[in-house]
């Protein structure tokens, strides 16, 4: 098997696992036993929509890190991307489990989100490792801000969702700092604006679909 074919097969396997297999977390879910509160129908619907958006974000994170791990030629940086991907995999598992508990479904457009994020990750990776790391920094900072807004919007009684989102927010901030420390280049203002616009489109659509 050629290296290129091996890489392609691994990428396809990762996509299928992310989109169709039940995710398994390597860390314990941060929810606290005994804090569960009965939510109203409206509160469950709101939490379900917000957690669906967060689940989409984790689908995209798997795609981004997979693409960047494929494109880098630096073994240490590849290990960095894969380690971050494993933590994002925990987020994927936690958000999916919480969706099930809330009686909500994942986004119907997850294959589209994955494909788009994988393409962006490939593009960033082709522009060089420092650009790729800069893309990680900006992505994670935007995700951190987005999660902070969800902590303000989630029902006060939804302790489980709030605990998950709070842990995710902390992890995303650390991922951004790790990428910055690894030598990330800052993204130009137009690129940041385009990323924000794309994120708004995704989150608005995923809220309903």
From Swiss-Prot:
Annotated catalysed reactions: a 5-methoxy-2-methyl-3-(all-trans-polyprenyl)benzene-1,4-diol + AH2 + O2 = a 3-demethylubiquinol + A + H2O
Pfam family, one: COQ7
Subcellular location: Cell membrane
Enzyme Commission identifier(s): 1.14.99.60
InterPro entries, sorted: COQ7_proteobact, Ferritin-like, Ferritin-like_SF, Ubq_synth_Coq7
Broadest EC class assigned to this enzyme: oxidoreductase
Topology in membrane: Peripheral membrane protein
HAMAP family per record: COQ7
Name this protein carries in UniProt: 3-demethoxyubiquinol 3-hydroxylase
Annotated organism of origin: Polaromonas sp. (strain JS666 / ATCC BAA-500)
């Amino acid at each position: 098997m050629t290296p290129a074919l091996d890489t392609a097969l691994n990428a396809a396997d990762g996509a299928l696992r992310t989109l169709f297999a039940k995710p398994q977390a390597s860390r314990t879910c941060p929810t606290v036993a005994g804090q569960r509160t009965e939510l109203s129908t409206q509160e469950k619907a709101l939490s379900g929509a917000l957690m669906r958006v967060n689940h989409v974000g984790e689908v995209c994170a798997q795609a981004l890190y997979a693409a960047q791990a494929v494109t880098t030629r630096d073994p240490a940086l590849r290990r960095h991307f894969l380690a971050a991907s494993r933590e994002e995999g925990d987020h994927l598992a936690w958000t999916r489990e919480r969706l099930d508990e809330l009686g909500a479904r994942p986004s119907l457009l997850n294959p589209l989100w994955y494909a788009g994020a994988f393409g962006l990750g490939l593009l960033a990776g082709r522009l060089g490792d420092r650009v790729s790391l800069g893309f990680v920094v900006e992505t994670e900072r935007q995700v951190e801000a987005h999660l902070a807004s969800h902590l303000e919007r989630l029902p006060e009684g939804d302790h489980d969702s709030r605990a998950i989102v709070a842990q995710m927010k902390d992890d995303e901030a650390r991922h951004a700092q790790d990428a910055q420390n690894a030598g990330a280049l800052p993204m130009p203002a137009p690129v940041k604006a385009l990323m924000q616009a794309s994120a708004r489109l995704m989150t608005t659509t995923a809220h309903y679909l």
